[in-house]
């Protein structure tokens, strides 16, 4: 009989993923969240935040390439980039692969977790925090944007989902926040973001985010990719007022990958463009969605995976 250690991740109250743990690397509680890092046979190191898997060593490159490069490659010359969240440093790592980048500002509220990543997760950041183009700001992203006058060519939003009615991240998923992001984009700028899992039990989460972003930007395009460490598809968004980010001109993405000499492990130009081809049921869900998340009534995700709205009382 196997008496090993196991981590149980409750996707909903009715579905659970079980992972065997080889050893515990680090665990603790910051002012913002609980963290737990363990070693597994299948996926290497696994980062848990508030009891949910956030990233795994073996496949993090799939998630981070999917998040970062569509936005970076649709922009002809991204020089200044803002990253909202992204505590492990892998989003920053991927942004800095683009030689056009002169400055990349990463704003994360949880400085303690960033230090955990620096110490225990070098496979993710790979020294990105030490790059002279990188600027790390420990602050609430909304407060930072309300205070700064800096503008960016690309903004990448890499946040945890707003799970739970008391989750302060809810205020980073509102139309007012997306308008604030847009106000800090240079002309021709683009926003890219993680936009929730695409799962039958969570069928409205991505459509609600998409519908909300549409209130702030002229062009909004969804795309998706399978993330093995999550055992499901994740949704992402590109948004811009200047151009349709999914209207790919033939050969442009491939040419930019070649010109920038990008060392990609997962994405190719054809695959990147194919991620924007969505199935009929998802297209219909995006078309039918009416919920818009606002500061007065921000949305949140219930333990069952439902999208709900309620005033934030935090």
Swiss-Prot record:
Pfam short name (any one) = Spermine_synt_N
Note the superkingdom of the native organism.
Bacteria
Task: Spell out the temperature dependence recorded for this entry.
Answer: Optimum temperature is above 80 degrees Celsius.
Q: Which GO terms describe its molecular function?
A: agmatine aminopropyltransferase activity; spermidine synthase activity; spermine synthase activity; thermospermine synthase activity
Query: What's its catalytic activity?
Result: S-adenosyl 3-(methylsulfanyl)propylamine + agmatine = N(1)-(3-aminopropyl)agmatine + S-methyl-5'-thioadenosine + H(+); norspermidine + S-adenosyl 3-(methylsulfanyl)propylamine = norspermine + S-methyl-5'-thioadenosine + H(+); S-adenosyl 3-(methylsulfanyl)propylamine + spermidine = thermospermine + S-methyl-5'-thioadenosine + H(+); S-adenosyl 3-(methylsulfanyl)propylamine + spermidine = spermine + S-methyl-5'-thioadenosine + H(+)
This chain's function reads:
Involved in the biosynthesis of polyamines which are thought to support the growth of thermophilic microorganisms under high-temperature conditions. It seems that long-chain and branched-chain of polyamines effectively stabilize DNA and RNA, respectively. Catalyzes the irreversible transfer of a propylamine group from the amino donor S-adenosylmethioninamine (decarboxy-AdoMet) to agmatine to yield N1-aminopropylagmatine. An efficient aminopropyltransferase activity has been also observed with norspermidine which produces thermine, and spermidine which produces spermine and thermospermine.
Other observations noted: In T.thermophilus, the biosynthetic pathways of spermidine operates via N1-aminopropylagmatine without the production of putrescine.
The protein's name in its UniProt record:
Polyamine aminopropyltransferase
What organism is this sequence from?
Thermus thermophilus (strain ATCC 27634 / DSM 579 / HB8)
The gene name reads speE
């Amino acid at each position: 009989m196997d008496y090993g250690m196991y981590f149980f991740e409750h996707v909903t109250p009715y579905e659970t993923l079980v992972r065997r743990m080889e050893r515990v690397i680090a665990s603790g509680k910051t002012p913002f969240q609980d963290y737990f890092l363990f070693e597994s046979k299948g996926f290497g190191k696994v980062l848990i935040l508030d009891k949910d898997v956030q990233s795994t060593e073996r496949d993090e490159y799939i998630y981070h390439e999917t998040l970062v490069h569509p936005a970076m490659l649709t922009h002809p010359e991204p020089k200044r980039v803002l990253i909202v969240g992204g505590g492990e440093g892998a989003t920053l790592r991927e942004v800095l692969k683009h030689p056009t980048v002169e400055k990349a500002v990463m704003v994360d509220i949880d400085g303690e977790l960033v230090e955990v990543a620096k110490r225990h997760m070098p496979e993710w950041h790979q020294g990105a925090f030490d790059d002279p183009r990188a600027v790390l700001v420990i602050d609430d992203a909304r407060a930072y944007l309300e205070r700064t006058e800096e503008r960016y060519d690309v903004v990448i939003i890499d946040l945890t989902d707003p799970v739970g009615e008391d989750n302060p991240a809810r205020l980073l998923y509102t139309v007012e926040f997306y308008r604030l992001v847009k106000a800090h984009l240079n002309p021709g700028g683009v926003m890219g973001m993680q936009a929730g899992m695409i799962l039958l039990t969570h069928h409205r989460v991505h459509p609600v985010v998409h519908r909300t972003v549409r209130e702030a930007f002229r062009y909004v395009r969804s795309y998706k990719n399978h993330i093995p460490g999550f055992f499901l598809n994740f949704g992402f968004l590109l948004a811009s007022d200047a151009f349709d980010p999914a209207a790919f001109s033939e050969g442009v993405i491939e040419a930019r990958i070649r010109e920038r000499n990008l060392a990609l492990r997962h994405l190719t130009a054809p695959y990147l463009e194919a991620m924007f081809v969505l199935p009929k049921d998802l297209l219909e869900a995006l078309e039918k969605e009416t919920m818009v998340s606002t500061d007065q009534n921000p949305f949140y995700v219930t333990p069952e995976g439902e999208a709900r709205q309620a005033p934030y009382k935090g």
